[in-house]
Amino acid sequence: MGKITDRVEDLAQPIVESQGLELVDVEYVKEGENRVLRVFIENPEGEVTLDHCENVSKNLDEKLDEVDPIQESYILEVSSPGIERPLKKKEDFDRFSGKLAYIKTFAPVSGNKEITGIIKGRDGDNIKVLKKDDDKELEIPFSQIAKAHLMVDFDNITG
C-alpha cells in the first residue's frame, strides 16, 4: 500500500501547497467493504476550514481521475489531522516542541519501544523527548521512529 500513498502524496502536494496549506499525511485503508483514501491537511496560518477541505478534495479528485493511480473503487476523505496529529517529518518535532507526544520505535530506546513524553526539539537527526513517567531525557534517532503523534495533555488542561 505504500506505493499508492506515495503516489497520492506526489499528486496531492502541489494541490495542497497551491492553497497555502501543508500536506500532513496520506492513508489508504480498508474499512469493512470499503477502501478509504484519507488526505490530512494543515493550515500554518490557523484552522483548516470546510472550504479548504472541499477545494483540496475537488482538485485532488480531478487529478486522481486523470492519473488513476488506484484501480479499485475508494472513498476520498480530506480533513485536518485532528488533535492527535501525526508527526511525520523531522521539522514536526521542532514545531511541536513542548507538546506531549506518543512515539513508537522500531527497536528499544533505553529499554522502551513505546515512549510518551514532552518533545524537546531535536539535535540533528535525533529527536529529544522528556519521558513523562520518569522525567528522563531520551534522544531517539529519527530513523528509528515507526510512528509518532501528538497527545492530549490532560494533566495540563486549564479551564
Curated annotation (Swiss-Prot):
Name of this protein: Ribosome maturation factor RimP
Subcellular location per the Swiss-Prot or TrEMBL entry: Cytoplasm
Organism: Halothermothrix orenii (strain H 168 / OCM 544 / DSM 9562)
Disulfide bonds: none
Family: Belongs to the RimP family.
Function: Required for maturation of 30S ribosomal subunits.
Keyword Signal attached: no
Domain of life: Bacteria
Keywords tagged on the record: Cytoplasm, Ribosome biogenesis
GO biological process: ribosomal small subunit assembly; translation
GO cellular component, one term: cytosol
Main location, first listed in the record: cytoplasm
Gene3D superfamilies: Ribosome maturation factor RimP, C-terminal domain (2.30.30.180), RimP-like superfamily, N-terminal (3.30.300.70)
